């Protein structure tokens, strides 16, 4: 059975580490041989993924004691890598009601590991049991946790990003537009550090919570059946961008009818207007929820474009 230590780390069973090793091998193959050529000879040294509770003594506002009531990050460390590393928090989508934990969580984490980037897959609380500000608070706590423990995890505290897909993309854009520097006098040292991500990556994101482009399911699960229009507008990320919003990479498809491309475009234009470095790629075809797009010859190019952006942004060694 898993064991939770005093820091909220849940120790996993050995067979889970074996599955992770196999998954890593698949993704190292998919991204090509250039990464492998740069690595030292010998087998990769993989650390077993560990799940860390964001609040080991119980999350604020928790309504139960099941896993769904316990926001957490699962830590994926790249092999044969010494710090300080770039890190990214991964928020799977699922309309703020479920989490696509493999397609939009574990798979991207393994991909980032092939680039030498540490990845932290976020398990955040969901509707209809939980509503705003719980989800945003979980995301902010994840950023603070990684930053506060950066030295322990050999991470560069100023290179911590946030990637989200679909509703997770809305969470990523919300974390990018609603953050603070931390409370220097807080009792909890994690609360003393900034919740601002240093960069953001959005995959076919929900952005707007106002008509006509919102995804109604995500909006309802996040805000409830009859939300205050002012609150919905304040959480429509295209209305909240400032010059302090972090540099952002956006991936979208024109054929997406679940979250129309107008979501991504409106956010990109807001970033451009605010002078925030941003790059967006809209593919002609492709369904919503394609993850890394590895089953589609065209869509599978977007992780490569992301890699180029990360390198140009100084986020890869």
What annotation goes with each model-predicted range?
Residues 141-218, 232-233, 237:
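Primarily recognizes the serine-hydrolase "nucleophile elbow" in alpha/beta-hydrolase
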Residues 76, 251, 261, 265-317:
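C-terminal catalytic histidine-bearing segment of alpha/beta-hydrolase fold enzymes
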Residues 250-252, 256:
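Short beta-strand/loop motif that positions the catalytic acidic residue
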Residues 21-33:
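Bacterial N-terminal signal peptides
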Residues 39-83:
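N-terminal cap/lid segment of alpha/beta-hydrolase-fold proteins
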Residues 84-93:
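Short beta-strand element of the alpha/beta-hydrolase
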Residues 92-97, 254:
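Active-site glycine-rich loops that stabilize anionic/oxyanionic intermediates
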Residues 100-102, 106-108, 122-157, 293-301:
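Catalytic nucleophile-loop/oxyanion-hole region of alpha/beta-hydrolase
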């Amino acid at each position: 059975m898993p064991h939770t230590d005093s820091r909220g780390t849940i120790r996993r069973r050995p067979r889970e580490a074996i599955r992770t090793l196999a998954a890593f091998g698949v993704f190292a193959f998919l991204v090509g041989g250039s990464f492998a050529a740069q690595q030292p000879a010998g087998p990769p040294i993989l650390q077993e993924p560990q799940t860390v509770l964001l609040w080991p003594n119980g999350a604020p506002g928790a309504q139960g004691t099941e896993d769904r009531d316990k926001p957490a990050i699962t830590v994926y460390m790249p092999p044969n890598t010494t710090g300080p590393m770039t890190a990214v928090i991964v928020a799977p989508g699922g309309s703020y009601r479920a989490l696509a934990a493999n397609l939009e969580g574990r798979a991207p984490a393994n991909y980032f590991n092939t680039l030498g980037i540490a990845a932290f897959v976020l398990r955040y609380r969901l509707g209809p049991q939980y509503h705003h500000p719980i989800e945003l608070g979980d995301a902010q706590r994840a950023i603070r946790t990684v930053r506060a423990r950066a030295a322990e995890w050999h991470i560069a505290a100023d290179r911590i990003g946030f990637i989200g897909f679909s509703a997770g993309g809305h969470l990523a854009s919300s974390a990018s537009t609603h953050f603070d520097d931390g409370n220097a006098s807080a009792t909890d040292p994690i609360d003393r550090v900034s919740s601002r991500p240093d960069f953001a990556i959005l995959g076919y994101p929900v952005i707007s919570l106002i008509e006509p482009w919102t995804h109604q399911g995500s909006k309802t699960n996040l805000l409830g059946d009859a939300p205050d229009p002012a609150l919905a507008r304040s959480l429509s990320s295209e209305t909240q961008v400032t010059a302090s919003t972090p540099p952002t990479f956006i991936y979208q498809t024109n054929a997406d009818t679940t979250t129309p491309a107008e979501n991504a475009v409106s956010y990109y234009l807001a970033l451009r207007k605010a002078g925030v470095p941003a790059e967006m790629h809209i593919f002609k075809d492709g369904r919503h929820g394609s993850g890394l797009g590895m089953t589609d010859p065209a869509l599978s190019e977007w992780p490569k474009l992301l890699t180029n952006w990360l390198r140009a942004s100084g986020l890869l060694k």
